[in-house]
Structures are given as structure tokens and as C-alpha cells.
């Protein structure tokens, strides 16, 4: 039986040596509503901007985000962009950057101008020198790469054709890795797959595959046939062709193709999705999974990546939500462990335009009255967060004999309900701090309160939100249930 937790534990033990073209990705978001009076060119009214580690650096970030360690070897120029990337990579606890500085070229930088409303790219500006690294830089790159091979469980070459992965660097790295029994995954850019000879797996997209094989690659059968010829030339074990919304096809040498459909998702930005696929394939294969399991994980990760704006990474929690059935996520994914985790989930929901609701309570012994309030609350919003009093908070409010169930047990019961999307445990006597942080669009309590008695009502009202009071079911309360149980025992 598939165990996601066991997979994550195995991933955490892996080290990936990632080599490739590092770049800075900048995204400038805005809208165009007029043409410049100076020239027939659109004027972009800038609303915000984001800066991310891109190219092979994004592969390294995804390796680290999913829980593995990454030794990253890349090239930077002697400029502010290079120093910024070096600092950013150095701040990642799971990434060990080994960067070579080439003062003869700029650090690659790409600036994309994107419609905030439609998430469409309007323009891209590049600062780069794409020529192969000079012989002395090649040697410095190899001096950085080869000593790290023994420490790695798997090697990943991320080729953006920006000068790092020259024919010599590719050849010497693959040959040295094979001598040590290390598998090598290549995300190729060159149409000459023969330069990657001896790699374990090549992961071209359909356009790259078509250019390299000169095949139409219009059907899975055509891809499989062309892949067998390409693998014979490249002497690799398998080829994975990514096909955007049509999923991906893996062709093992001499074996039957494996097709995995794309997961349904609203696509916001495809930038860096190939990086995510390569990273997840590497760490999952290094962990001992087979081709099918690695493809399944990579497909799920790609679905998460394209649903985000900009160059994005995928976390274990996001991957879990895509891979596992919804019902199995309750205790593990619905219970928030930190404010940062809560903020990230809120950011994602608001990016999707979802209406967030909030209710709270001790929920010591869940009864039909609770279920009615929770169901009504979920019906008034798109995502419901339940604030749960901690054990210490319950004791202060209800007395030393309470709670009957400890906070983790209460949280797991709530998380198992379909109406509940998140459970946040709070230590204070009231959920005011949580409400202030969340700023819900809907605040829900039982009808035994008045609007003015509902903690946080003024915060919600100030933001244009609603306060909803749900009629309580008579005869149902935790206090009365506990009292009746004790009377029965005596």
C-alpha cells in the first residue's frame, strides 16, 4: 500500500546534486488600459512585482521545498544580480550553493510583464549571454561538480542553454557519475540528445522532443516509437515527455510506455513547471520509488506549480493534497500548526478569490448542535476555519474537570468533518487574535449569542464582512452531556 509519510521520510534522507543555469526571475504585474502617446506601445500600469530564484536554481528550490537536500552548482556574473542570487541560495537551509563567478558575462535575468487580471504574459526582457562557458570556466565548474558526486544520491542536470552545461561539462559529469553508480536525470535543452549519452532519464517537453526526434509526436504511439530511437542514440534507460495539459508519457527502453494524465487545475502560470517536474522525479526516484510512482508525484507537483503565479515551489503538504484522497487529509492537513502555515493557506485561498469564514468553540464532545452550526457556517463561505480553544484555555473557561478530550483529539474530530477546511488551536481565552489575523468575510456563532457579544464582530464589520448567528438545537450542550454522563455513572 502506498504510504505518503514513508515516502516523505525517505525523501528527507536524499541528497541531490543539481547542476545547471542559474537565473533571476522577476515578475511585474499590472494592467494595460492605454497606448503611449510617445509611440504605438502599450503602457503597463504596474501594481506589484515579485523576484524569485529561477532556472536551475528553481529546480534546487523545489528539491529543498519537498524535503531533500540539494548541492547546487551554477554560474553567476560579477554583478548585483549574481550577489543577490548567491545570498538568496545561501539563506536556504537545505541548499548548499557552490557557485562559480564568471566576470565576463552577466548573471542571467528575465523580467516578465504579466496581466494581473488575466495572468497572461505580455512581454519578457532578458539580460544574458548564452554562449558556452570558456575553457577556464568549464574547468572551474568541473572542479566544483566532481568532488560532490560521492555525496549525492542522484544527479540532476538542468540545461537552459545559458553556458553552464557545455558538452565537456555534461560528458565528464555523466561519466564520473556512472563510475560511482549514480543515476543521472537530464532536463535537456539541446536538440542533440546524443550529448547526454549515458544519462538515466531525459525529460524533454513535447516541443523539445519534437525538435530532437524530428517526429510529429502528435499521439502517444508516435511519442513511444520516436523515444525508442532517441534512447538508442542517447544510451539512456528511459525518456519522459511532458505534454502540458495532456499529461506526460514515460517510455522505458525496451518496455511498455506509461501514460499519466494531467490533473484538472486552473492554470495561472506555467513558468518553472518543468523545473518542478524534474525536481520531484529526482527526489522520488532517489527514494526508491518506481517509474509509475515517480510520475504520479511529478504530475501532482506540476498541477500545484501551474496553479500559482510566477516561478513557484511545491511543499509536501501541497503534494499530499494532490496525491491522497480528500478524506485521508483530515488530521494531517486541516490542523494548522503555525501562524505562517495559516498565512500561506489564506494567501492561496484569497488568490483564488475564495470567501473565508470563521467560527470557534471548545468542541469538547461534538454533538448535533455543533454540527448544525458548522454546516451552516460552511454554507455561508467557500472555506471554513474553526478556531479551537486549547486545553489550557478550556480549563480556564470551564473548570479543572474540562476538557473531556485533549486538544489534539478534539482537533482531529473537527478535521474529519467535510464542512471544516482548517482547524486552528488558540491558547487565549478568546479567538480575537486569530480573527484579527484571518480577517474573515463571514463570522459565525450559535444563536444563543447576540451580534454584539460575538468576539471580533467589529473587525469583520469594518472589513465589510458578515456576522451570522445560527439557531441552536435545544437540549444539546457539552455541559449538559457531561453532567448526564456523570449522573449515569453515579
Swiss-Prot record:
Pfam families in alphabetical order: CTP_transf_like (PF01467), PfkB (PF00294)
One GO cellular component term: cytosol
GO terms for biological process, alphabetical: ADP-L-glycero-beta-D-manno-heptose biosynthetic process
SUPFAM superfamilies, sorted: Nucleotidylyl transferase, Ribokinase-like
Region (Cytidylyltransferase): 358-490
Reactions mediated catalytically: D-glycero-beta-D-manno-heptose 7-phosphate + ATP = D-glycero-beta-D-manno-heptose 1,7-bisphosphate + ADP + H(+); D-glycero-beta-D-manno-heptose 1-phosphate + ATP + H(+) = ADP-D-glycero-beta-D-manno-heptose + diphosphate
Pathway the protein takes part in: Nucleotide-sugar biosynthesis; ADP-L-glycero-beta-D-manno-heptose biosynthesis; ADP-L-glycero-beta-D-manno-heptose from D-glycero-beta-D-manno-heptose 7-phosphate: step 1/4; Nucleotide-sugar biosynthesis; ADP-L-glycero-beta-D-manno-heptose biosynthesis; ADP-L-glycero-beta-D-manno-heptose from D-glycero-beta-D-manno-heptose 7-phosphate: step 3/4
Role of this protein: Catalyzes the ADP transfer from ATP to D-glycero-beta-D-manno-heptose 1-phosphate, yielding ADP-D-glycero-beta-D-manno-heptose.
PANTHER family given in the database record: BIFUNCTIONAL PROTEIN HLDE
Similarity section: In the N-terminal section; belongs to the carbohydrate kinase PfkB family.
Subunit description: Homodimer.
Protein name, per record: Bifunctional protein HldE
Naturally occurring in which organism (per UniProt): Rhodopseudomonas palustris (strain TIE-1)
Gene of this entry: hldE
Amino acid at each position: 500500500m502506498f504510504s505518503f509519510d514513508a515516502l516523505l521520510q525517505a525523501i528527507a534522507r536524499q541528497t541531490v546534486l543539481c547542476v545547471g543555469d542559474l537565473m533571476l526571475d522577476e515578475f511585474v504585474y499590472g494592467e494595460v488600459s492605454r497606448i503611449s502617446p510617445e509611440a504605438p506601445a502599450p503602457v503597463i500600469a504596474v501594481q506589484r512585482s515579485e523576484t524569485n530564484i529561477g532556472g536551475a536554481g528553481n529546480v534546487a528550490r523545489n528539491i529543498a521545498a519537498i524535503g531533500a537536500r540539494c548541492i547546487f552548482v551554477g554560474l553567476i556574473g560579477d554583478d548585483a544580480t549574481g550577489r543577490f542570487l548567491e545570498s538568496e541560495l545561501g539563506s536556504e537551509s537545505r541548499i548548499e550553493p557552490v557557485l562559480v563567478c564568471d566576470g565576463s558575462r552577466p548573471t542571467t535575468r528575465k523580467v516578465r510583464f504579466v496581466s494581473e487580471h488575466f495572468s497572461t504574459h505580455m512581454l519578457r526582457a532578458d539580460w544574458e549571454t548564452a554562449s558556452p562557458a570558456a575553457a577556464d570556466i568549464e574547468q572551474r565548474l568541473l572542479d566544483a561538480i566532481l568532488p560532490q558526486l560521492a555525496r549525492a544520491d542522484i544527479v540532476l542536470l538542468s540545461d537552459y542553454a545559458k553556458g553552464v552545461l557545455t558538452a565537456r561539462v555534461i560528458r565528464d559529469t555523466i561519466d564520473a557519475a556512472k563510475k560511482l553508480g549514480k543515476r543521472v536525470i537530464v532536463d535537456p535543452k539541446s536538440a542533440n540528445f546524443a550529448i547526454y549519452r549515458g544519462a538515466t532519464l531525459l525529460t524533454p517537453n513535447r516541443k523539445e522532443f519534437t525538435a530532437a526526434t524530428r517526429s510529429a509526436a502528435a499521439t502517444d504511439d508516435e511519442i513511444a516509437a520516436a523515444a525508442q530511437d532517441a534512447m538508442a542514440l542517447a544510451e539512456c534507460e528511459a525518456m519522459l515527455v511532458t505534454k502540458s495539459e495532456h499529461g506526460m508519457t514515460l517510455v522505458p527502453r525496451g518496455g511498455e510506455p506509461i501514460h499519466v494524465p494531467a490533473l484538472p487545475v486552473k492554470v495561472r502560470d506555467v513558468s518553472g513547471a518543468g523545473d518542478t517536474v524534474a525536481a520531484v522525479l529526482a527526489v522520488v526516484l532517489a527514494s526508491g520509488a518506481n517509474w509509475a510512482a515517480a510520475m504520479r508525484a511529478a504530475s501532482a507537483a506540476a498541477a500545484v506549480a501551474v496553479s500559482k503565479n510566477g516561478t513557484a515551489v511545491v511543499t509536501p503538504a501541497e503534494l499530499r493534497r494532490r496525491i491522497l484522497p480528500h478524506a485521508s487529509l483530515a488530521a494531517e492537513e486541516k490542523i494548522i500548526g503555525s501562524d505562517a502555515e495559516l498565512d500561506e493557506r489564506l494567501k492561496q485561498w484569497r488568490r483564488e478569490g475564495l470567501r473565508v469564514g470563521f467560527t470557534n468553540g471548545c468542541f469538547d464532545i461534538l454533538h448535533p448542535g455543533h454540527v448544525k452550526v458548522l454546516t451552516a457556517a460552511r454554507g455561508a463561505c467557500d472555506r471554513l476555519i474553526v478556531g479551537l480553544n486549547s486545553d489550557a484555555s478550556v480549563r480556564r473557561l470551564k473548570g479543572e474537570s474540562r476538557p473531556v478530550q485533549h486538544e489534539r483529539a478534539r482537533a482531529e474530530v473537527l478535521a474529519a468533518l467535510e464542512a471544516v477546511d482548517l482547524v486552528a488551536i488558540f491558547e487565549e481565552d478568546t479567538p480575537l487574535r486569530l480573527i484579527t489575523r484571518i480577517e474573515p468575510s463571514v463570522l459565525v456563532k450559535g444563536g444563543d449569542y447576540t451580534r454584539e457579544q460575538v468576539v471580533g464582530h467589529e473587525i469583520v464589520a469594518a472589513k465589510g464582512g458578515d456576522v451570522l448567528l445560527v439557531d441552536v438545537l435545544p437540549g444539546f450542550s457539552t455541559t449538559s452531556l457531561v453532567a448526564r454522563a456523570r449522573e449515569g455513572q453515579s
